[in-house]
């Protein structure tokens, strides 16, 4: 009894420490602008590290306890060949790291139905699964595959390589056979006319994959040029390379677009290239900068070839020559001083001057204060 009580107390102690630490740092994380999901991932990682160290027996997270319960419920069904356990993925095309003895792969939708992609682990080793980087939703979503789903599937990796997954006869591992890869490329406009604005046009690409799997839908960004002439806007499509027989390019409205079309008159478009819908890339920006530099060089060459006449610098007429300076001071009765205050009443002025020198009738006078009147 004492040993059993000790076994139940130690996991609770560790869990209480983890909960206290997470609750204490939650406010600090929120003040620093860190999302709470990061805190939950930290908690999950901490629990997984503790379970991997085997320092505490019976320490299981809620997700793993749910996995064990589901496995026990579906144990009679696992003995039949037409039932399999799988995990629904939380993010598209993301594999889950696990221990060496667990075979787990990412499998797309079946041939008969457009079901979401799933992660299929080995049913015999599901209790040893390492869910270090799995979220709570992905770990808890443990369902049974419907009848009719064969164990032979195909997957599409992040790098574009198509792999075929074949379950071995012993049911303990999967064999990957590389197939043809499908790569969706982005077509970039080679050059653009002066005064044009580049507008992205989205097209759907239906690429049938080998093995009879339903076509995978991708997106190709086809840039176009928009020329603004007055109140009209002309759209000039760029030439697109001929597709392969395994691909068919279809526009978003369902009409087939030829490789080259004449300029069409359309209503003015308002383009948005910022935010989540931004389709501009670094390559497009680099090409636009190179084009602007080339245009400036062409203008400089044209100006040098046409006139080759040196233009007068800006504000050249504002420069004061020495002759103008001499004419300005060739006057009599000059006063150079500081003014203390000035009063004005209609056309009468009264000056209070100080610390100055004045030239009157060819003689210089120095004064500290002076008062004068004038009318004009």
Swiss-Prot record:
- One GO cellular component term noted in the UniProt record for this chain: transcription factor TFIIA complex
Q: Where is the composition biased (Low complexity)?
A: 69-79, 89-105
Modified positions (Phosphoserine) are 280-281, 316, 321
Instruction: Give the region (Disordered) as residue ranges.
Output: 69-107, 247-266, 274-329
Outcome of mutating residue 270 to A, per the record? Slightly affects cleavage and yields elevated levels of the precursor
Record's comment on post-translational modification: The alpha and beta subunits are postranslationally produced from the precursor form by TASP1. The cleavage promotes proteasomal degradation.
Q: What is the effect of changing residue 274 to A?
A: Abolishes cleavage
Q: Name one GO molecular function term.
A: DNA binding
Q: Compositionally biased, Acidic residues: which spans?
A: 280-329
Q: How does it assemble?
A: TFIIA is a heterodimer of the large unprocessed subunit 1 and a small subunit gamma. It was originally believed to be a heterotrimer of an alpha (p35), a beta (p19) and a gamma subunit (p12). TFIIA forms a complex with TBP.
PANTHER family in the cross-refs: TRANSCRIPTION INITIATION FACTOR IIA SUBUNIT 1
Q: What name does the UniProt record give this protein?
A: Transcription initiation factor IIA subunit 1
Which source organism does the UniProt entry give? Answer: Homo sapiens
Which taxonomic lineage does the organism of this UniProt entry have? Eukaryota, Metazoa, Chordata, Craniata, Vertebrata
| Gene name linked to the record | GTF2A1
């Amino acid at each position: 009894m004492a040993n059993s009580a000790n076994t139940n107390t130690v996991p609770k102690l560790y869990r209480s420490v983890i909960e206290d630490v997470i609750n204490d740092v939650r406010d600090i994380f929120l003040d620093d602008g860190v999302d709470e999901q990061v805190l939950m991932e930290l908690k999950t990682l901490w629990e997984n590290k503790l379970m991997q160290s085997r320092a505490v027996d019976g320490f299981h997270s809620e997700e793993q306890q749910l996995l064990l319960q589901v496995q026990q419920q579906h144990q009679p069904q696992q003995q039949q060949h037409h039932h399999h356990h799988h995990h629904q993925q939380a993010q598209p095309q993301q594999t889950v790291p696990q221990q060496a003895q667990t075979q787990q792969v990412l499998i797309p939708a079946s041939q008969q139905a457009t079901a979401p992609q799933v992660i299929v682990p080995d049913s015999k080793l599901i209790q040893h699964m390492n869910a270090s980087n799995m979220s709570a939703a992905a770990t808890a979503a443990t369902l049974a595959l419907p009848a009719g789903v064969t164990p032979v599937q195909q997957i599409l990796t992040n790098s574009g390589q198509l792999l075929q997954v074949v379950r071995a006869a012993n049911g303990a591992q999967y064999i990957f056979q590389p197939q043809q890869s499908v790569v969706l490329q982005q077509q970039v406009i080679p050059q653009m006319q002066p005064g044009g604005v580049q507008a992205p046009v989205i097209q759907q690409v239906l690429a049938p994959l080998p093995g009879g799997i339903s076509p995978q839908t991708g997106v190709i960004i086809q840039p176009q040029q928009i020329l603004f002439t007055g109140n009209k806007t002309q759209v000039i499509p760029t030439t697109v390379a001929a597709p392969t027989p395994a691909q068919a390019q279809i526009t978003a409205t369902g009409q087939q677009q030829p490789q080259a079309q004449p300029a069409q008159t359309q209503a003015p478009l308002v383009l948005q290239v910022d935010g989540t819908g931004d389709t501009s890339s670094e390559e497009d920006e680099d090409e636009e900068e190179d084009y602007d530099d080339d245009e400036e060089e062409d203008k400089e060459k044209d100006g040098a070839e046409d006139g080759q006449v040196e233009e007068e610098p800006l504000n050249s007429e504002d420069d004061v020559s020495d002759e103008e300076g001499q004419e300005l001071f060739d006057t009599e009765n000059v006063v150079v001083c500081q003014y203390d205050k000035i009063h004005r009443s209609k056309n009468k002025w009264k000056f209070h001057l100080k610390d100055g020198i004045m030239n009157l009738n060819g003689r210089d006078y120095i004064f500290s204060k002076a008062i004068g009147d004038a009318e004009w």
